[in-house]
Amino acid sequence: MGSTLENQVALVTGGRRGIGQEVARVLGNEGALVIATATTSKGAEAISANFQASGIQGHGVVLDVTDDAAMDACLKKIQSEHAAPSILINNAGITRDQLLLRMKDEDWDAVMATNLRAVYRLSKICLRDMLKARFGRIINITSVVGSMGNAGQSNYAAAKAGVAGFTRALAREVAGRQVTVNCVAPGFISTDMTEGLSESHKEALLQQIPAGRLGSVADVAGAVAYLASPQAGYITGQILHVNGGMWMG
């Protein structure tokens, strides 16, 4: 276990599986006390059990990132039981894919609420303590789709592009207090979802990726861990693409 994040408290949303789970594990292995969120009690309990088995400080909590009162209560509990988060990883996200002419208003609104508004709200309530401490790391998980678009994902692309703009604006506001704000933008990452794709679909994806392979959750978590580290204190307002060369803009 490393110690580059010793004495730091990290809040990771969407920490039950996939990228969020690996980010929480890596930050914990670097010495941070990690609070990772899930949408159900069962999910939060699984996070806590995984942490205990791995020797990671921290635990899982239930959080609906679209519920302002729940976010406020979650932060107050973390502050009272541990300390204010000095690292915030806004990872929770959903998709509601559909061609625009078939997309329902509620599908647009749901994606915006979870993928964009929650980033604004959690960043806002965590920021005050970071500014007082004159240290903080806010890392938002976006997507290559926010840069290049993808048919059937106008809601998701708009939300992720919005997070990128939010990140750059906030970075300018808080840089003088030693708080950095950055994005990590994954490309196509190997997950349970991609494992279920047909071989022809996988091949079509790989043809778009110069590296010739799908990314791993470890690829993404490594980028997040670097941006959270003391060594990244002079990096802010950046979008770090982790996509095997699929997007180079």
Could you tell me what each predicted segment is?
Residues 99-100, 104-112, 194, 205:
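Substrate-binding pocket helix/loop in short-chain dehydrogenase/reductase
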Residues 143:
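Residue(s) in the substrate-gating loop at a strand-loop-helix junction
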Residues 128, 172-176, 233:
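Alpha-helical segment proximal to the catalytic Tyr-Lys
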Residues 123, 159, 167:
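Active-site helix of classical SDR
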Residues 30-46:
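Conserved glycine-rich Rossmann-like NAD(P)H-binding loop of the short-chain dehydrogenase/reductase
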